[in-house]
Every structure is written in C-alpha cells, then in structure tokens.
C-alpha cells in the first residue's frame, strides 16, 4: 500500500458488524458510515446481505459476508452452498473459516478440499480464508497459507474476532512471507486505532477487518468491539 493517509486507510477497511444480535438499524448505520468514510466494504453475516446490498446500492462500497462462521466446522458442502446463496443475495466478497480441527489434525487434503469447494462456489467473487491464528502453531499457520497460495484464493485472513485473540503483527508478517506478494493478507480482530492499523499494513496486511474504522480514519482514539 503506497499511502497510510486516511483515504488509503479507509480503502483498506472492511467495516464490520458480525454480532449475533445486530439489528437492521445497526446494519443501516454501518452502511451509512461506510459510504461517508469511503470504506472498501461492509462485512456482515449472510442473513444481512440483502438488506446491506440495498443500503449500499449505487455506492462504491462492497458487501462482504462470512461463511462457516465463526467455527469453520460445518460440512464443506454446507459452506459451499452458503457461499453460493450469499453471493446470489448480493455478496461481493466471501470470508470463510477453514476447518481448524482438520488443520490441527494434519488432514491437509481435507482442508484443501474444504477451501476448494467454497472457492469453486465463489466463481469470480474474491474468497478470503480465515485461519484463526490464535489456535494454531507456526507450522500450522504456514501450511494453511501454503494451501491457500496453491489454490489461488484472494486473501488469507488472521482471525474471526470471536476466539481467544485477534491479529498480531508477527502473524501478519508470517502470512505475508508465505503467501508472497500476489495474495492479500487481512488482519482482523483487535485492530482498533490508527497506530495498530498502520503497523498491520507495514507488517504486510492489505485489508483490515474492524468495527473501529471511524476511529482509525479520524484518529479519534481507540475504538471498541471487533
């Protein structure tokens, strides 16, 4: 990323609201904020996609949705179906959670097939793969990134924001080293202020998942939440 100025930071942000109790009013506010501040996308649960798409019609802000979230432990066919249905409903990017248990068990072919099923369902829609790095050791993080690189996904992503902890600079740097320059790295979970956002980008992130986008682009202290 060539600039860390507010406009460039805004275009790196997926403005996020994934709470189970998120209301229509909150989603409408999320979308209005994304329009106002020029965020790249809003990131919402799949059931909120049609409403968010209507709110953002005519704007440059994209609708991103999560799949297999937050555990990643569902059937691969279910994840693929959810991705396809969510795209049909208006999603323009998909963030999926890989099967963490399979990865930790060393079932790498199964992990690959799980991601590949969703990737196929996405077609030309960019797919980000969430590793949930706080649950993995370094070798597992590396293997997950290698699989994602080999499959040609659009991004690898650190975290759901719903587990033990979120993105770290060390994990972002590791992921960037493994996937190389052609795949995006999304840092999510705990990115709540401009200093952290800039540090994540300097470490190799090209996208930030956060509910604190306004605090980041205005420099207004530390945001709360995701």
UniProtKB/Swiss-Prot annotation:
Localization per Swiss-Prot or TrEMBL: Cytoplasm
Coiled coil residues, start to end: none
Name recorded for this polypeptide: Deoxyribose-phosphate aldolase
Short name of any one Pfam family annotated for the protein: DeoC
GO cellular component entries: cytoplasm
Biotechnology: DERA is a potentially valuable biocatalyst for synthetic chiral compounds. However, the poor tolerance of acetaldehyde limits its applications as an industrial biocatalyst. Mutations that improve the aldehyde tolerance represent an effective strategy for enhancing DERA activity.
SUPFAM superfamilies given in the database record: Aldolase
EC number: 4.1.2.4
Lineage, highest ranks first: Bacteria, Pseudomonadati, Pseudomonadota, Gammaproteobacteria, Pseudomonadales
Active site: 95, 157, 186
Family of the protein in this entry: Belongs to the DeoC/FbaB aldolase family. DeoC type 1 subfamily.
Name of the gene: deoC
Temperature-activity profile: Optimum temperature is 30 degrees Celsius.
């Amino acid at each position: 990323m060539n600039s860390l100025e507010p406009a460039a930071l805004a275009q790196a942000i997926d403005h996020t609201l994934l709470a189970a109790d998120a209301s229509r009013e909150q989603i409408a506010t999320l979308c209005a904020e994304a329009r106002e501040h020029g965020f790249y996308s809003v990131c919402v649960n799949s059931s909120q996609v049609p409403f968010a798409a209507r709110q953002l019609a005519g704007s440059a802000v994209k609708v991103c949705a999560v799949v297999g979230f937050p555990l990643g432990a569902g059937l691969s066919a279910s994840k693929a179906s959810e991705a396809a249905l969510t795209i049909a409903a208006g999603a323009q990017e998909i963030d999926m959670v890989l099967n963490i248990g399979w990865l930790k068990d060393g079932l790498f072919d199964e992990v690959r097939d799980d991601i590949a099923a969703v990737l196929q369902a996405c077609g030309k829609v960019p797919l980000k793969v969430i590793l949930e790095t706080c649950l993995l050791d370094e070798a597992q993080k590396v293997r997950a990134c290698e699989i994602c690189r080999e499959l040609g996904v659009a991004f690898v992503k650190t975290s759901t924001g719903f587990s033990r902890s979120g993105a770290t600079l060390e994990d972002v740097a590791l992921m960037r080293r493994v996937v190389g320059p052609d795949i995006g790295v999304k840092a999510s979970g705990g990115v709540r202020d401009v200093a952290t956002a800039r540090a994540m980008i300097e470490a190799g992130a090209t996208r930030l998942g956060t509910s604190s986008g306004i605090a980041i682009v205005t420099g207004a202290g530390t945001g709360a939440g995701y």
